[in-house]
């Protein structure tokens, strides 16, 4: 099947819910926010939970329902805190926008309340100094500006900020919810996706609906309307399951040379070792033939190797270390001594 003609619009945006009530699998959040929207009197808000569960979508839907398309750009400031997270941004861009007062005239049937909204995406990556500076800005301009903080880890938001917000937890999306949404997009775009491919997409996206939709669009552009599990794995960067199982099998052989050869093959094929470690962890944890004590030793080494990779260590040496420790754990050999 020939690839589909590329669309200029990402499907993540094309199929993003425009109203709060359309956000999937967040019934409690939707119920509370729908009631709050009827009065248009919103507090500062803090949305937290795993990626791809609808946090940003909900914030944008609230803003759109309050102001409509005409006033949206002048009343809403969106900032990705991963890029704009320093104290200077708080002192200039955010403060300047927050300080401007606005009217409350209804326009086009939208409530248009007398305040603006600042949406800070990935707020948990803001520096502590920037968050402290933001606290003062929130207090000073609370009558004319509302802040929406969006983060994955609420523990990284300082308590003085978190205590000033209404907190909403976004639950991880179930496989059924993700599958229903993906099948809806497939029907709209004329795609054919069998049950195995659908299960694969759910697995490689790890409950992140945004990531799943992106993988689906990438596969459609490259492989056409009929998409297989192999197609999805190739566009996602996930490592084929047989590669991960081959590494474990080489470790189970008890032969270091066999494991070393498998490690060399993995490095030569260019697979990212950090991704391999993540998938290897899943295989180890779910293995029925490995005792818990041995699993614990292997998982400890996987965590250490992952940390070393983040710090810039050599991929080959780290993967070889993982393989050798896995052999020692599987055959109850003594652990290596660290001096």
UniProtKB/Swiss-Prot annotation:
NCBIfam families: PRK00440.1
Induction of the gene: Down-regulated by sucrose starvation.
Source taxon at top rank: Eukaryota
Disulfide links within the chain: none
Compartment(s) of residence: Nucleus
UniProt cross-references to Pfam families, sorted A to Z: AAA, RCF1-5-like_lid, Rep_fac_C
Tissue note: Expressed in roots, leaves, shoot apical meristem (SAM), flag leaves and panicles.
Organism: Oryza sativa subsp. japonica (Rice)
Family: Belongs to the activator 1 small subunits family.
Main localization, broad class: nucleus
A GO BP annotation: DNA-templated DNA replication
Listed name of the protein: Replication factor C subunit 2
Keywords: ATP-binding, DNA replication, Nucleotide-binding, Nucleus
Assembly information from the UniProt record: Heterotetramer of subunits RFC2, RFC3, RFC4 and RFC5 that can form a complex with RFC1.
Encoding gene (name): RFC2
């Amino acid at each position: 099947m020939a690839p589909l003609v590329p669309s200029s619009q990402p499907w993540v945006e094309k199929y993003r819910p425009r109203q709060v009530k359309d956000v999937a699998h967040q019934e409690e959040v939707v119920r509370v926010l729908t009631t709050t929207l009827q009065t248009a009197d919103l507090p500062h808000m803090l949305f937290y939970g795993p990626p791809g569960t609808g946090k940003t979508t909900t914030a944008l839907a609230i803003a759109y329902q309050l102001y409509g398309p005409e006033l949206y750009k002048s009343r809403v400031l969106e900032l990705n805190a991963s890029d704009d997270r320093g104290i200077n941004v708080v002192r200039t861009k955010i403060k300047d926008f927050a300080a401007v007062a606005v009217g409350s005239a209804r326009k086009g049937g939208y409530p248009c309340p007398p305040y603006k909204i600042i949406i800070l995406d990935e707020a948990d990556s803001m520096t502590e100094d920037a968050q402290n500076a933001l606290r003062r800005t929130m207090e000073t301009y609370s009558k004319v500006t509302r802040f929406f903080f969006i983060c994955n880890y609420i523990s990284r938001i300082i308590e003085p900020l978190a205590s000033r917000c209404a907190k909403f937890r976004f639950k991880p999306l179930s496989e059924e919810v993700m599958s229903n949404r993906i099948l809806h997009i497939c029907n709209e775009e004329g795609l054919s996706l069998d049950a195995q491919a659908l299960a694969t997409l759910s697995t490689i996206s790890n409950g992140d609906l945004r990531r799943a939709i992106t993988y689906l669009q990438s596969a459609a552009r490259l492989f056409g309307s009929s998409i297989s599990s192999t197609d999805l794995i190739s566009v996602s960067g996930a490592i084929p399951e047989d590669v991960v199982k081959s590494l474990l099998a080489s470790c189970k052989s008890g032969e270091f040379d066999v494991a070393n050869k498998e490690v060399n093959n993995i490095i030569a094929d260019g697979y990212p070792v950090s991704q391999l470690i993540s998938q290897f962890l899943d295989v180890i944890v779910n293995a029925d033939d490995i005792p818990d004590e041995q699993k614990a030793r292997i998982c400890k080494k996987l965590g250490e190797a992952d940390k070393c990779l983040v710090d810039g260590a050599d991929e080959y040496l780290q993967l070889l270390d993982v393989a050798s420790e896995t052999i020692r754990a599987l055959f109850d050999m003594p652990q290596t001594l660290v001096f």
